[in-house]
A protein has these predicted regions:
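Short coil/turn segments at secondary-structure boundaries
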Residues: 154-158
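Short, well-ordered loop/turn elements at secondary-structure boundaries
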Residues: 91, 145, 152, 165, ...
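Short FAD-binding loop at a beta-strand-to-alpha-helix junction that anchors the flavin cofactor
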Residues: 174-185
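Structured core elements
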Residues: 5, 96, 165, 170, ...
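Active-site and channel-lining beta-strand-loop segments
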Residues: 27-30, 161, 167-173
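An anion/pyrophosphate-binding glycine-rich loop and adjacent beta-alpha core
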Residues: 1-145
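Hydrophobic packing and interface segments
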Residues: 138, 149-153
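Short loop/turn motifs at secondary-structure junctions and domain boundaries
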Residues: 149, 159-163
């Protein structure tokens, strides 16, 4: 499942987000590792990465499904990108979920329906943001409260998380069980 990565002491655990966000958002990481490192170090923001330098890895790998691949596929792909050094938050364990294209798409659609100027960027952004706010406003508000970034303007940072277990044994992130020195592989 999709979650907000831990971003500081104020957040004791991962915060689960709705999978429905992937219906409209586009998932990406920088194509260049140096850019990912600069983001992790706080030297640049995701808005500094040009469209050409963004890797929409789910759309690239699964063109027929894009960001709507099953969540286990999306989770594995996001973890693989982060493990390869392209993760974007301070820990390197996050990818971006970007709503800019959806805001424009919905904004143009709404302008067309209302008979208004579809080329007016301010109008399109206002109308599109309104649609996204109606669909995901509570999730965006929760995200902004935790991360202190406006997800209507800056891509969200997300990461896969365990949602529930289906039996088995407990292990930590290094696959060590509760028995010291015993690992489950």
């Amino acid at each position: 499942p999709t979650c907000i990565p831990v971003s500081g002491d104020h957040q004791s655990k991962l915060t689960l987000m709705s999978e429905s966000l992937r219906n409209d958002g586009r998932i990406w990481v920088p194509k260049i590792k140096k850019d990912a490192a600069s983001i992790r170090e706080g030297k640049i923001s995701p808005l500094d990465i040009s469209e050409d330098n963004r890797d929409y890895f789910l759309e690239r790998r699964y063109p027929a499904f894009g960001n709507l691949v099953p969540r286990d596929v999306a989770s594995r792909a996001a973890k693989e990108r982060c493990d390869a050094g392209f993760g974007v938050n301070a820990t390197g364990e996050a990818v971006y979920l970007d709503f800019a294209a959806a805001i424009i798409r919905y904004g143009k659609e709404q302008a067309h329906i209302k008979g208004e100027d579809e080329s007016n960027q301010d109008l399109v952004n206002k109308l599109g943001t309104s649609v996204i706010k109606k669909k995901y406003g509570n999730l965006f508000q929760m995200y902004e409260k935790i991360v202190d970034q406006n997800p209507y303007e800056t891509p969200m940072m997300i990461y896969p998380a365990v949602h529930y277990t289906m039996g088995g044994i407990w292990v930590d992130y290094n696959l060590m069980t509760t028995v010291p020195g015993l690992y489950a592989i």
